[in-house]
């Protein structure tokens, strides 16, 4: 499972290079000054990232089975 998750993570991260706005705006983080986006990796995980000029900053790989309030505190 770890190898599959890693490969999915790399595939999605590479896709962000071509299409940085492919992820949805992250509802849980709308109150922040930055526009956090998320991109689903698999059925349990997603990348949470921001676009800063030409850079894509991945803030966390989030396990969606966790309490959503933890995401607000973590990022």
Predicted feature residues:
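Enriched for short, Lys/Arg-rich terminal
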Residues: 41-75
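Noncatalytic linker/hinge segments flanking ATPase motor cores
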Residues: 4, 14-15, 47
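A general, composition-driven signal for non-globular sequence regions
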Residues: 6, 31, 40, 59-60
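Conserved GNAT-fold acetyl-CoA-binding loop/helix
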Residues: 1-8
């Amino acid at each position: 499972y770890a190898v599959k998750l890693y490969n999915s993570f790399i595939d999605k991260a590479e896709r962000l290079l071509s299409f940085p706005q492919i992820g949805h705006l992250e509802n849980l983080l709308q109150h922040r000054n930055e526009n956090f986006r998320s991109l689903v990796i698999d059925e349990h995980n997603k990348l949470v990232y921001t676009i800063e000029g030409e850079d894509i900053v991945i803030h966390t790989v989030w396990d969606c089975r966790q309490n959503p309030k933890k995401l607000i505190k973590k990022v």
